[in-house]
């Protein structure tokens, strides 16, 4: 490829064959991730809808379908680890429409039990956003893709905000107000569960103008991505006094700090709003269906699943910390269900963490945790 030349796999697609369409696809939410079925090779495949990522396909499925490498790309994962990937182009079936020449990063999920379980066959990512008007409707468990905005409900009376995109892979960004004198942009990332995850520059700017009400600290890893588990270190959450997306006020929000910019608006916002993205027009719509409520408290710990189920993060003074949980402890059972690295066990564990109480057994103790 000549220096500065845009690779053909970025310009050839993706494309939709049909001119006029409205499709509705059933979706399922688990641990903040949105699952849907996509047809590839004549079979339904389970994908994750992740607006904060380019589209990906598991190496095993790419091999099964005989997809040819059309390029390579280098990027960083959520924790800053450099990842080099082969690129393939694929045809996808979504309801009654066909997507052609979709560029997909080939990823080996098999090296991580959690990735293999939770990412399934791949990711439907941000480069498909300009192809139609997308609507994520959790109350109806439906993802819609419409050729025209006028085909959709949930727009009249909704909060219309600006949606920014800066070329391939068409990652969506939103205007955010973190304090009276602190404005920024955040990625709309449905692959991230928390309502808001704050970047170091945004945190510093918000703190400087008095927009932070306080901090909560913890110890452990900020999570696992394709480049592996991030190292254990001191972690912090910041209570933002008043957060807004454009003029959509979200009020006081507790935000975990991430390692990199930008900040993220995550899938938790879908638990209160039907969200419609019109990338071509640069607009996003939030139709509130549930009254804004205080953020739900947590048990105060997180799990990792590679090499067995282990405690990966504990927040200070939380129910988990008070019960004696420590980073690195092996978890034996959750709600009396044995914990291991199998996919059913991982899904059971993540479901258990959504309850109001949790019985946990680990190597060294047992406790009944309740949300504060």
Task: Please place each PLM-identified region on the residue numbering.
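Pepsin/retropepsin-fold aspartyl endopeptidases
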Residues: 1-372
